[in-house]
Each structure stands twice: as structure tokens, then as C-alpha cells.
Amino acid sequence: MSLEPFSKSEALTFGVELELQLVNRHDYDLASASPDLLRMLKGKEYPGDIKPEITDSMIEISTGICHSHDEALWQLREMRDRMAEAATALNIGICGGGTHPFQQWSQRQISQSPRYQYISDLYGYLAKQFTVFGQHVHIGCPNPDDALYLLHAMSRYVPHFIALAASSPFVQGVDTGFASARMNSVSAFPMSGRAPFVLTWDAFIAYFDKMHATGVIESMKDFYWDIRPKPEFGTIEVRVMDTPLTVERAAAIAAYIQALGRWLLLDRPFMPVEDDYLVYTFNRFQACRFGLAGEYVDPATGNRGALADHILETSKLLSAHAEALSSEGALDMVREVVEARDADAEWIRAAQRETRNLHETVRRGCGRWTQAATQPA
């Protein structure tokens, strides 16, 4: 099949997807509960969409097309609250976090959709190991060439997104030492990593056609890039974030990405070059391993400094754009997280140090996810 045309979308509109954990209330291990939860939600009114994911222990919520931080936050809260009501009736818990701290991948059940069965047949045990939980943010682009510009310009800031959302320090009962261990599961897939450096849609079509001719890929869904174009939506999709522990933080990170996109598209502060990617894997690793305590090499200057400082410096450049988007509060939340080094991975580790029990840590995570909307993130 050929690459579908790039659809028209309103520039800088955005959408948020969150993959969530479903756990039992006995020992807070993952539960194969998505079919039952979806049945409970059938006929209920809520914005956005709620649908199954690759294994039955996961569920995905996604907003509609949003113009503002407040709109996205309202939609996420509404879906969270409807799901919490259904989960209570089923006696299951729902929580955020990029990995479940102690689940065993071999116990997972692949969802029945043909797409997920195909992935399981193709990738074997990697499909079950892909029971990890991410936040994706779509940004509307006025045309396909602008989408590719934004994709590559925004790639410099991938470490920001990883560190701000990092919430997966534990895997199979072990503290990995990573702030975002989830990304290691994604990296195992052959079509993961960064998108090829092409800046025109014609060149991207030529790349896609070559890849399709080899039989390696069938559609854009087969690319697991950190940021990828989504021509059917007229967006780029940022895919590197762990699912935060609250919808408030998820919405703030999405608004940060929207403001960054506005700055990049309107001001065009630099033109991406292929050498930007010389330090890409180093910066990405630093964010995954150390989170907000990581280092960052500026691709433009080669200067090495603190990732947290680079996020704060960037946030100053975004202030006017956040004001134009009515998302100043979200940008302030991002700054507060960075200044306090208050990533969710640190909350999870602190809960584990206090309880010395990962089951109790997950229980507390469920409470954090379903907290009243008036509570801070």
C-alpha cells in the first residue's frame, strides 16, 4: 500500500493518549480486566475515547482534538472519573506509571484484535514484554513539510519529555536504576528509534515506498519512532513519555509540548540538520537513566550541562507562547517539577522506601491516579 495523503489539521491543536495499568485489589498485580471494564463503560457518556491495548491488563484513553490545556485536562479528568466508577464496581484499580513494578511479562494475555495478534506472532515474547505504559501527544500541523520540520526540530527536546514524565524505575520487582526503564522495552523493536532525516514530504514518501517495497513495513503503524508523522490525522505524534501518575501532570506535559511546537513553528529559531542526531542517543539515554538529574549536550553548540537547566532555559523562551495558548499554569507546573526534581519516578521510589512493599506502592499509585481533581499533581 502507498502512504496515505497528509490530512489537513488545525495547526497546534493537540490530542493526548494515555496507556493505563489495570490491577486487582488483592495484591495489586496486573489484572486481565480490560474486556470487563469496557463492557461496564458501554453506553456511558464521556469525551474522547477509551479502548483496549496490546494486552488485557492495559487500557488506553485518548482525548478528542483540543485547543487548550484546560480543554485537555477536562477531558482527561472526565474519562478518569468514569473509569474510576466502573473500576470500583469491578473491584479493580487503575493507575499510571510507565511500568508495573513487579508484574511478570509471561503471565500477560494478548488482546484479541487482529492487529495485536499479528504483532504477537511477529515479535514473539517482545509483544508481552511490551506491557508498558506511555503517554503520546499529537500536534496538529498545517502541512506535511511543516510536520517534518517540527518532528526534527522537536527531536532536540526529546530528553525534556522523557525526564518530565519518567515514572518507570521498577521492572519485575527490581529497581533498575533508570528513571524511565519503559524506554528499554520500546528500543527492542527493530523499527524504533528516530525517524529518518528528511525534510520534505516527497522525500518521506520515497523513503516509505522503499521500505514498503522490501516487505519490512506495511503501514506507518509499523514504525515505533520516538516521534512519527501521522498523516491520517495531520499530526506528528510524540511517543517517548511514560504515563504520569496523574492526569494533571499528563496535561501539563502536553501543554509544554504544544507551547514548544508553537515556538518552533512560528519563530523558526533554527533549521534542523542531520548532525543534531550525533548526540541524540546520548541525550536520550541520560534522560532515561537519570531523569531530571541527567546531563544534556546541546546539539547546536556541543556544550554539556544539566538537563534540568536546559528545560528551565527553554521554558523561558516559551512563556509568551504559553500565554498565547492560555497555558501559563501548565508551564508553571512544569517549572515546579523541574526545580524540585519532583519526577514521578522519585515519588515511586520514595513510596517504596517508606513501605518496603511494592504491592502497597501500587495501591498508593492507584489512589494518586483517582485523586480528586482539586488536589495538586
Curated annotation (Swiss-Prot):
GO terms for biological process: modified amino acid biosynthetic process. The keyword Glycosyltransferase does not apply. It catalyses: L-cysteine + L-glutamate + ATP = gamma-L-glutamyl-L-cysteine + ADP + phosphate + H(+). Keywords: ATP-binding, Ligase, Nucleotide-binding. Pfam families: GCS2. Its EC number is 6.3.2.2. InterPro entries: GCL_type2/YbdK_subfam, GCS2, Gln_synth/guanido_kin_cat_dom, YbdK. Signal peptide: none annotated. GO terms for molecular function: ATP binding; glutamate-cysteine ligase activity. PANTHER family: GLUTAMATE--CYSTEINE LIGASE 2-RELATED. NCBIfam families: gshA_cyan_rel, PRK13516.1. ATP-dependent carboxylate-amine ligase which exhibits weak glutamate--cysteine ligase activity. Belongs to the glutamate--cysteine ligase type 2 family. YbdK subfamily. This is Putative glutamate--cysteine ligase 2. It comes from Ralstonia pickettii (strain 12J).
